[in-house]
Amino acid sequence: MKKIAIYPGTFDPITYGHLDVITRATKIFDNIIIAISNNVHKKTIFNLKERIKLTKLATFHLKNIKKVIGFNGLLANLAKREKSNILIRGVRTIFDFDYEIKLAAINKQIYPDLDSIFFLSSKEVSFISSSFVKEIAKYQGNIKPYLPKEIHFALIKKFKDIPQK
């Protein structure tokens, strides 16, 4: 039986930090579903359709990415629907770990077969976050080291299209 893992996130936008986790996970799991959250309480710069498209662009070269999907609702319920019992989570800091441990416990209560596997960020990308990258882009800083080329161009264009206050 193939091991299907889900890597959830907002991916606004997908960064080299995310790709580090995804690439390493492809060496362990047969199939990976990248699940992009459509959390209405989180303010995103890219809409869900754009985030799915950009994530597909950034991961097209990875053969065992089963699909890139958007989702609403509980992650544990998505895992059940997709017949997956593994969540992949990236951890950069002790603060991330503290949050992720609590989330894993809640997901386990909802779906007892669901396990969370934590990937420590590689040191080269451990400081990258989508929020930091967007902040740098907003003020026309150099974001090339943090994003694949296609994502870099999309983010620059997005900030040009948004009127600055």
From Swiss-Prot:
Any Pfam family: CTP_transf_like
GO cellular component, one term: cytoplasm
Residues at the site labelled Transition state stabilizer: 18
Cofactor(s) needed for function: Mg(2+)
Alphabetized InterPro entries for the sequence: Cyt_trans-like (IPR004821), PPAT (IPR001980), Rossmann-like_a/b/a_fold (IPR014729)
Leading EC class: transferase
GO MF terms, alphabetically ordered: ATP binding; pantetheine-phosphate adenylyltransferase activity
Keyword field: ATP-binding, Coenzyme A biosynthesis, Cytoplasm, Magnesium, Nucleotide-binding, Nucleotidyltransferase, Transferase
CDD domains: PPAT (cd02163)
Cell compartment(s), UniProt: Cytoplasm
Signal sequence region: none
GO BP terms in the entry: coenzyme A biosynthetic process
Catalysed conversion reaction: (R)-4'-phosphopantetheine + ATP + H(+) = 3'-dephospho-CoA + diphosphate
Binding site for ATP: 10-11, 18, 90-92, 100, 125-131
EC number annotated for this UniProt entry: 2.7.7.3
Binding locations of substrate: 10, 42, 75, 89
Involved pathway(s): Cofactor biosynthesis; coenzyme A biosynthesis; CoA from (R)-pantothenate: step 4/5
Its job: Reversibly transfers an adenylyl group from ATP to 4'-phosphopantetheine, yielding dephospho-CoA (dPCoA) and pyrophosphate.
Family stated for the protein in its record: Belongs to the bacterial CoaD family.
Assembly and oligomerization: Homohexamer.
This protein's name: Phosphopantetheine adenylyltransferase
Gene label: coaD
